[in-house]
Design a protein with these regions (language model features):
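Glycine/GP-enriched mid-protein hinge/lid loop-to-helix segment characteristic of carbohydrate kinases
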Residues: 2, 18-24, 28-30, 39-42, ...
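Short glycine-rich, Thr/Ser-proximal phosphate-binding strand/loop in the N-terminal lobe
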Residues: 2-49, 56, 81-83
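Short beta-strand segments
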Residues: 9, 67-73, 134-144
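Short, glycine/acidic-enriched loop or turn micro-motifs at the edges of active sites
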Residues: 12, 115, 139
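Glycine-rich phosphate-binding loop and adjoining helix at the ATP-binding site
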Residues: 41-48, 64-68, 74-133
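Structural signal for hydrophobic packing residues in well-ordered secondary-structure cores
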Residues: 51, 55-58, 103
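Alpha-helix termini
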Residues: 55-62, 125
């Protein structure tokens, strides 16, 4: 198992990036602009460049990186594919597959509200709770209910 992982939140204005230890400890966070021109074609290459630059800056071997988790606005299937993300101007996009190609790292993608709720349940305000309701309000309202019964 790698020592590090990246968490990425793709928003309509900025992409929030985090380098973490696999125990959930935040090492560093930063943002890059979300470039939506040309149907958002540069968003994932920009994210990959930011991840690769941080690996180089910190002197981390890619063998020490478990992977990249990326949250995007819109429905994401179990393969990490998006059929449409309206506020990013995306039609179909294999988010996980493209990130793997661009970074050489294992990647998983999910809906931004879902992965935010998972993070809160693991290390955030909902840690230790058996049931969680998360509401996000950014460019859209999203609601997630997690019941661990």
């Amino acid at each position: 198992m790698g020592t590090y992982c990246f968490g990425i939140d793709v928003g309509g204005t900025t992409v929030k990036c985090g380098l973490f230890r696999t125990d959930g400890t935040l090492v560093e966070k930063w943002e890059i602009p979300t470039r939506k021109e040309n149907n958002g074609d540069q968003i994932l290459p920009d994210v990959a460049a930011a991840v690769n630059a941080k690996i180089e800056e910190k002197g981390i071997s890619k063998d020490d990186v478990e992977g990249v988790g990326i949250g995007v606005p819109g429905p994401v299937n179990s393969k990490g594919e998006v059929d449409r993300a309206v506020n990013l101007y995306w039609g179909y996009k294999n988010v996980a597959g493209e990130m793997e190609e661009l970074t050489g790292l294992h990647a998983k993608a999910g809906n931004d509200a879902n992965v935010a709720a998972l993070g809160e349940a693991w290390k955030g305000a909902a840690a230790g709770s058996s049931d969680v309701i998360m509401v996000t309000l950014v460019s859209a309202v999203e609601l997630l209910l997690m019941a661990r019964s």
